[in-house]
Amino acid sequence: MKKYLVGGAVRDSLLNLPITEKDWVITGSSAQEMLSIGYEQVGKDFPVFLHPKSHEEYALARTERKLGSGYTGFICHTEPSITIEEDLYRRDLTINAMAYDMNGNLLDPYNGQKDIQLRLLRHVSNAFYEDPLRVLRVARFAAKLKNIGFTIAIETFEIMTHMIHELKSLSPERVWMETKKALITDNPQVYFQVLKKCGALKILFPELDILFTIPQCTTHHSNLMNLGNQTMTRLSNISCLSNDLAIRYAILCCNLGSEMNPRKQPLKQLTQKKPQISIINNLCNRLKVPNNILKLTKIVFMYYHDLYDVTKLSSEMIMTIFQAFDCWRTPTRIELIIKINQSQLLGSKFHINYLFFQSTLLRTAFNETTQIKANDIINSGFSGINISQELYSRRLHVLKHWKNKFLTHKQ
């Protein structure tokens, strides 16, 4: 029996990146032997075992043979005679097809170390064709490693463009899993840009793909030209401001359904936005996006464009936004609102000082309204539904008074 550290841990160690998890491959052993020495089997499709103490995953070396379509049409073969080189051959990218033996020696049969030096994402073999999920994985690695200069090898990208016909065979869970991982990278927009370029976006995310055909109606980012590019820019912006998966996904969806409003008329009411909300619902249901993310996405969508220039908002609208985001019960939500505002202003025609001005307006406006407490209303003799009505009325009065002074002072 021989043990090898494989996959992302090897790649990240060579890139001097943090190692978040370790995966191991065992050669010269069998499932029966692994069980007999205390490992717990967890893999259904192929033998994967948990170490009895570290609980790290150990897989028996295996080869794969494609029999059907999609990513599930594989027959896995394990036996003690399979070598580590054979196991690494089935992997997607050369940078993921390296291993360390237990003496710390690097095994690199497919030149992964060279591609690390070249900063290239290159497929290991033509077996890459056999798994359509690899299109998403390569796009995700392009997003993950963008900051350190990685790009996709030309020949690998060409293969990806010829694989898109099999993408429909992917389960929603697998698509969401890769997308979720991509969204929490430093450059999530790269994931969608790669999918767009290779033709996968129109198959997996047609709601996003159509945005690249819709001209942008504002001159604030005149170089972006269309709503698809605008969405990518704002996704990049929010990623500089927040690591939160839910808010990044919400910003990704901020322009969905724009093709249903060709005249670009302001849509203020929920009834006017129902067709667009239904597109968000359909996308999230198809991908099986968690309900908490769906809920936030719809709230952000409702008020996203209002938050472009908060100096133009009425006090009533500011109160409505605070209520929609449940700020008084969850005060940290005000920072979320500010980040949504900033994600639209970064890189625009506005000076950076104006960005901070809007942030100050939102933050201070909220703080002013929090000075009015429910207990103050109760102590004034109000009860029942009258409490919330009076609380709203007083907060609105305070906000109007403060906002007038604030804007007058800044002029």
Curated annotation (Swiss-Prot):
Domain HD stretches: 227-328
InterPro entries: CCA_bact, HD_domain, NT_sf, PolA_pol_head_dom, PolyA_RNA-bd, tRNA_CCA-adding_enzyme
Residues annotated as binding Mg(2+): E21, D23
Entry binding sites for ATP: G8, R11, R91, R137, R140
EC numbers on record: 2.7.7.72
GO biological process, one term: tRNA 3'-terminal CCA addition
Family: Belongs to the tRNA nucleotidyltransferase/poly(A) polymerase family. Bacterial CCA-adding enzyme type 2 subfamily.
Extra remark: A single active site specifically recognizes both ATP and CTP and is responsible for their addition.
Protein name: CCA-adding enzyme
Organism in which the protein naturally occurs: Blochmanniella floridana
Gene name tied to this protein: cca
